[in-house]
Amino acid sequence: MTARIDDTAAEENPRAVARARFVRVTPMKARRVVELIKGRSASEALAVLQFAPQAASGPVSKVLASAVANAENNLSLDPDTLWVHRAYVDEGPTLKRFRPRAQGRAYRIRKRTSHITVEVESRPKKVASKSKSQKGSAR
């Protein structure tokens, strides 16, 4: 296999990553919350997570705040220019427990864990351009 060199890769925006591993929340429920923040600005994503009713929004919010802090402290980036570039949830190990049932039976309980990863990217702020035609303007 040969690796192709991409010209746009040289001009990539700086990125910072934060991971939380072995979080005691099911990956399926965490993915629901992560989908809310993909592609949003970091400040907007934190606001969305603050008011999200899901229990998984707490750990996801902490990971996002950590990624923003990593960008600010390690890469000297402005927090106002940060966007959620990638966010995903991987499945961690499952703790297996048993619940005793009637007549000597036992049901298995699976306590699932997640690995949450959030990657923020610094994008330059866009300057508002003047529109070509303005309503009601004298020509």
Curated annotation (Swiss-Prot):
SUPFAM superfamilies: Ribosomal protein L22. GO terms for biological process: translation. The keyword RNA-binding applies. The keyword Iron does not apply. GO terms for cellular component: cytosolic large ribosomal subunit. Coiled coil: none annotated. GO terms for molecular function: rRNA binding; structural constituent of ribosome. Keywords: Ribonucleoprotein, Ribosomal protein, RNA-binding, rRNA-binding. It comes from the Bacteria. Residues 118-139 are annotated as: Disordered. Residues 125-139 have a biased composition (Basic residues). Belongs to the universal ribosomal protein uL22 family. Part of the 50S ribosomal subunit. This protein binds specifically to 23S rRNA; its binding is stimulated by other ribosomal proteins, e.g. L4, L17, and L20. It is important during the early stages of 50S assembly. It makes multiple contacts with different domains of the 23S rRNA in the assembled 50S subunit and ribosome. The globular domain of the protein is located near the polypeptide exit tunnel on the outside of the subunit, while an extended beta-hairpin is found that lines the wall of the exit tunnel in the center of the 70S ribosome. This is Large ribosomal subunit protein uL22. The gene is rplV.
